[in-house]
């Protein structure tokens, strides 16, 4: 257990503002990712074949719906149940662990999407790379099942690491600038060890994502040089596909790094320094990142854009019909 001589309190106004922002982020994130899920799932209901990228987007939207739900539960825990003067309760620790696992599955899916973009857009000249790209295109469903299996294995290992590690106490003495002496008694760092384990387990998919994204960037550079020499038309479908894919991957990289840094900072803020305001800021950042990438995916996917246009036209026609009906009812006979 951690005992500090000074504990920062959080006012009711701050907690209410944070909860309002959390509800808003949950609503936006749920709507955007539910939209991606429903558009692709509707094709499954109609028994239309899904492309490989649509299958990945379907799984990605499910994982992000789970992420948003966990972050919203974390916000409720912070504002109503988790006290600064007490150690982390088991429910909040469980939420953090589940978020780490869901975030790791999200990273594996993004790496899978990056590999898929490489196999579809890059023109390989080496025989091995051509066979590898063809294998990725054929085995995308098996890769998705493998991601689910890896997530389950990670869940079991994290639970085992969390509950099997023995309890211990570490006392640390810190001298502040005003010569204030703080005795830190840190007990049961199992959550932090599980957190580090999940981050280490995320290194392989992150490296895979970086390598495939780098290959796509190099391919885009080569394609643009080829266009300058041989092609005069600025509208090239291959170039547009490269740019859209890179926008999606670069935006995911930025959002993932920001979200991971916020998550990593939030753990010592709450365990060591009991800075609930800092944790609230980190949770808000973590909740905003999946919504931002979902918006980028919708803007870069033709099928999703058509669905958005259809919904907007339907809403506009419905409002027009309702307005005409009200105008007719007010007109005297």
From Swiss-Prot:
It holds the Pfam family TAS2R. It is found in: Membrane. Disulfide bonds: none annotated. One of its GO terms (cellular component) is plasma membrane. Its main location: membrane. It comes from the Eukaryota. The chain crosses the membrane at residues 18-38, 56-76, 95-115, 143-163, 191-211, 252-272, 277-297. Keywords: G-protein coupled receptor, Glycoprotein, Membrane, Receptor, Sensory transduction, Taste, Transducer, Transmembrane, Transmembrane helix. Residues 1-17, 77-94, 164-190, 273-276 are extracellular. One of its GO terms (biological process) is detection of chemical stimulus involved in sensory perception of bitter taste. It is a multi-pass membrane protein. Glycans are attached at residue 178. Residues 39-55, 116-142, 212-251, 298-333 are cytoplasmic. CDD domains: 7tm_TAS2R38 (cd15025). One of its GO terms (molecular function) is G protein-coupled receptor activity. Receptor that may play a role in the perception of bitterness and is gustducin-linked. May play a role in sensing the chemical composition of the gastrointestinal content. The activity of this receptor may stimulate alpha gustducin, mediate PLC-beta-2 activation and lead to the gating of TRPM5. Belongs to the G-protein coupled receptor T2R family. PANTHER family: TASTE RECEPTOR TYPE 2, TASTE RECEPTOR TYPE 2 MEMBER 38. Most taste cells may be activated by a limited number of bitter compounds; individual taste cells can discriminate among bitter stimuli. This is Taste receptor type 2 member 38. It comes from Gorilla gorilla gorilla (Western lowland gorilla). The lineage of its organism: Eukaryota, Metazoa, Chordata, Craniata, Vertebrata. The gene is TAS2R38.
